[in-house]
Amino acid sequence: MGRLKQCWSSLLVLAVLVIGTGAVPITYLQSAVAKGAVCLDGSAPAYHFDKGFGSGVNNWIVHMEGGGWCTDVASCNERKGTMKGSSKFMNKDFGFSGILGGKQSTNPDFYNWNRIKVRYCDGSSFTGNVEAVNPANKLFFRGARVWRAVVDDLMAKGMKNAQNAILSGCSAGALAAILHCDTFRAILPRTASVKCVSDAGYFIHGKDITGGSYIQSYYSKVVALHGSAKSLPVSCTSKMKPELCFFPQYVVPSMRTPLFVINAAFDSWQIKNVLAPTAVDKGKEWKNCKLDLKKCSAAQLKTVQGFRDQMMRALSPVHSTPSRGLFLDSCHAHCQGGSAASWSGDKGPQVANTRIAKAVGNWFYGRSAFQKIDCPSPTCNPTCPAISTED
């Protein structure tokens, strides 16, 4: 009896520890495989689902995981052996925090919603849709099908009754949230309040240090390889080249669903890959600067400041529309809503004396609008982290 009691005590402690970490088990969507909705390697798509409760039982956050893109067979093949290209390598449990957090103290507006993290394994921001599978490389470019299969599954699990819903994401997942935002709105009940949140997904059609646009050629390869054109918003592709419709600044003007953009003006991923990508930095003069802005020369800092100017212009469709929200800090960071510390913590970034969680919550519920742009230099905001962060 004593041993049984001890066993139950151990299980109780273990349960408390698991609940305390916010670990949410993985769900493999095996039924999607027959529809051809699969990861790069052909494995089933996956997500983590923490059910809502209390007043949040009919409210839903669907959060799209980030993780860059693959532009050719070689880079996509590399992903096949990792969680970025196969659900076989994904961690079985995922700790929810930040915008997905389940604690009222750190996520007061959304803690009891149905919270879903959609895993990213297609390399196309959930836009790929190529029917043919090359027998030589056995790569599947089916991101758009994965997206639809996951949404259909969630609808069957109760999202069809949603009263409030948010489609959000980080980085490449945040771009997906923008690209699929209006479609998400159309799927849900007409009476539901549906909005979208992009965290570090506002990738700009910017110039690099040579005066060219490396990122445009990069996105062109993504769109061509994955057959993304037919999955991008028609309101954009009817006016310009499909690869340009990977840039939010060309998609947002015709979006009908309210959008909140969380971004760093000195986005660390974009400084490294839009402004000073290794491919154009032949002499590696930017190697140290782009990792730590404190190591930039005066001339480099001027160029970095010019990148912020490009960001400001690209964001004009956001701050020119009252229904949209904007939290643009001057941090050297990328994805700031994924941890409790940066989402709502005492030491998290602030703009206009407001933390991200409060800004997004107030905007979603219509308590107050929020379109705030931080001070202009990369060292002006003392609430920014001391070192570059990429959650």
Curated annotation (Swiss-Prot):
Protein name per the record: Pectin acetylesterase 7
EC main group: hydrolase
A GO CC term assigned to this protein in UniProt: plasmodesma
Localization: Secreted, Cell wall
Signal peptide: 1-23
Keyword line: Cell wall, Cell wall biogenesis/degradation, Hydrolase, Secreted, Signal
Pfam family name, one: PAE
Family: Belongs to the pectinacetylesterase family.
Domain of life: Eukaryota
GO biological process: cell wall organization
Its biological purpose: Hydrolyzes acetyl esters in homogalacturonan regions of pectin. In type I primary cell wall, galacturonic acid residues of pectin can be acetylated at the O-2 and O-3 positions. Decreasing the degree of acetylation of pectin gels in vitro alters their physical properties.
Main location: secreted
Any GO molecular function: hydrolase activity
